[in-house]
Amino acid sequence: MIDSLDLVIDTVLAREVLDSRGNPTVEAEVLLEGGAIGRAIVPSGASTGAYEAHELRDAGDRYFGKGVLKVVENIEERIAPTICGLSASDQATIDGVMSELDGTENKSKLGANAILAVSIATARSAANGYGMPLYRYLGGPMASLLPVPLMNVINGGAHAANNLDFQEFMLVPHGANTFREALRMGAEVFHTLKQLLSEKGLSTAVGDEGGFAPNLQSNQAAGDLLVKSIEKAGFIPGEQISLALDVASTEFFKDGAYFFGGRNYSTEGMIEELVKLVNAYPIVSIEDGLAEDDWEGWGLLTKELGEKVQLVGDDLFVTNTSRLQRGINQKVANSILIKVNQIGSLTETLQAIDLANRSGYTSVISHRSGETEDTTIADLSVATRAGQIKTGSLSRSERVAKYNQLLRIEDELGSEATYAGSNDLGPLCGKK
């Protein structure tokens, strides 16, 4: 039996650490009266939506302005005195107290990175206090669904120094029976792709998220390479492994037009290009197919493709319930990308997932391009039964760490574990 006093927050500490790009980020530690401790490190994005919560940086010369000593100070001198003495098991109260202390809509006073680090560290400390894994603490007895990984094996856009306009070209091994099998399938295609790139004399250097970053003639060339890699690895495209795209179109949207492939496209022209891709390749998911403020265009895109593929809002929704509700009301998209640092607290993240579930939208739990060894999103994907996770390619330890955590969870669950697979993507698989 847990003594409630053991769950009371005693100490909150913070430190400046580095992310996978060598940039500073913040780690928080929450120590409870009973001795349990929770740690969390927050990630950082490269292609960030205009409506994301504010990531606080120091400015100045140190780390070229990217230091987070101000964030550390805010945690230890402002947040800590406010939440010490509260129970770590009362997540919503603690997150609410921090948001109130900040007092801004986008958490710009204390920094979303400060609030999120403490929020997740609090949840981890409570889980450890109860002696249970994080996915079980957050998700309860129903937390047993392992997600389909959307594996970013070709990087472009803001994630790589190459000539590809689209940001991510992903493998979706929905035809597997277990997560372990899905991971193997993805890894085998990844290595086959590397071999094909080498044979063509193309670069096998990797981008921020561990995928290859070759200079290819077009986005279609990337699709062709992935289909060939799937087949050469011994799998059936569209049946065992499909494709997903993160277009990240806000990055090349300017003055009302989309510029990629050397020419400008209207919204209607952009939609036409996406339709061509869906008809030509086994694509089951498209993220940010249009820009974050092109609401009218998103409505047209959803009418055109919403019954055929998963249309994911990332920059469009930024894990924000207000923007998601607008999308629901306007029948825009059918899925939300969940990035904990876009909204800045665990409670608000869970609220966004809940709203999506209640509204018939899917949720895709996601990493950021600037990641760390923190594996919270792996547990979160199982806790919420989201059914899908984006955590990069099959290389770079900060990406693989999440996959390995999911393997541990699957082993721990044993016969209770189920793999989302084609069932979770549902009619989106093979609905062409």
UniProtKB/Swiss-Prot annotation:
Root EC class: lyase
Cofactor(s), names only, from the UniProt record: Mg(2+)
Record-listed Mg(2+) binding positions: D246, E287, D314
UniProt xrefs under PROSITE patterns: ENOLASE
CDD domains per UniProt: enolase
Predominant subcellular localization, coarse grouping: cytoplasm
Any one GO MF annotation of this record: phosphopyruvate hydratase activity
GO biological process, one term: glycolytic process
Localization (cell): Cytoplasm; Secreted; Cell surface
Role, per record: Catalyzes the reversible conversion of 2-phosphoglycerate (2-PG) into phosphoenolpyruvate (PEP). It is essential for the degradation of carbohydrates via glycolysis.
Family listed: Belongs to the enolase family.
Protein name: Enolase
Organism, as annotated: Prochlorococcus marinus (strain MIT 9211)
